[in-house]
Regions:
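Short, polar loop motifs at secondary-structure junctions
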Residues: 1, 14-22, 30-33, 82-83
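Alpha-helix C-terminal capping segments
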Residues: 6-8, 19-24, 69, 86-91, ...
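Short, acidic/turn-prone active-site loops that include or flank metal/cofactor-
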Residues: 18-20, 31-35, 48, 98-102, ...
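Metallo-beta-lactamase
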Residues: 65-132
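Short internal beta-strands
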Residues: 10-18, 120-125
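Binuclear metal-ion centers of metallo-dependent hydrolases, dominated by the metallo-beta-lactamase
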Residues: 24-37, 41, 110, 114-152
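Core dinuclear metal-dependent hydrolase active-site scaffold
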Residues: 26-90, 104, 150-152
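Active-site metal-binding motif and surrounding structural segment of the metallo-beta-lactamase
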Residues: 1-15, 90-95
Length: 152
């Protein structure tokens, strides 16, 4: 339903193999695949998975993707459904999911932000999670602006 709501005849769908199979269309990207979309636009598929014991059944390692979109010199990390992963570096804008049991706790999102050090953080997927905990926990991080948007 979400894709249908915004899709046009020119929409290019890029998905991990599992989602590609469910959609029965689109271009498949696996962890570590890189796609050059234009001269100054690159998309990298990065791992997205649960790390908390007992939660790995929701997003097992190797199945799902997050993405790093590079536009010119700006690197945007869209984490997908994942928990705190320490390997992300040189990120300008980060979109991090905050909603246990499927993604990060507020504390994990705070730690991930402190490691990644993006200029801008957009927490998302937070449902009933008190997202202000993330903003409060990062209030002393002078290099990161936390932007919270109410999305439908």
């Amino acid at each position: 339903k979400a894709i249908a709501a915004i899709e046009t005849s020119g929409t290019r769908i890029i998905a991990n193999p599992n989602c590609r199979k469910m959609l029965n269309r689109g271009q498949e990207m696996k962890n570590s695949d890189v796609l050059q979309l234009a001269d100054d636009m690159k998309l990298e598929a990065v791992p997205a998975y649960n790390t908390t014991p007992g939660r790995d059944k929701f997003h097992p390692k190797g199945r799902d993707n997050g993405y790093i979109l590079t536009l010119g010199g700006t690197r945007i990390y869209i984490a997908g459904d994942t928990e705190e992963l320490n390997q992300m570096k040189d990120i300008d804008i980060a979109f991090l999911p905050v909603n246990q049991p499927y993604t990060m706790t507020p504390e994990q999102a705070i730690r991930a932000t402190q490691i990644i050090k993006p200029h801008i953080l957009y927490p998302y997927h937070y449902g009933n999670t008190d997202i202000n905990k993330v903003k409060e926990g990062l209030k002393n991080e002078k290099t990161t602006e936390v932007r919270i948007r109410a999305l439908q």
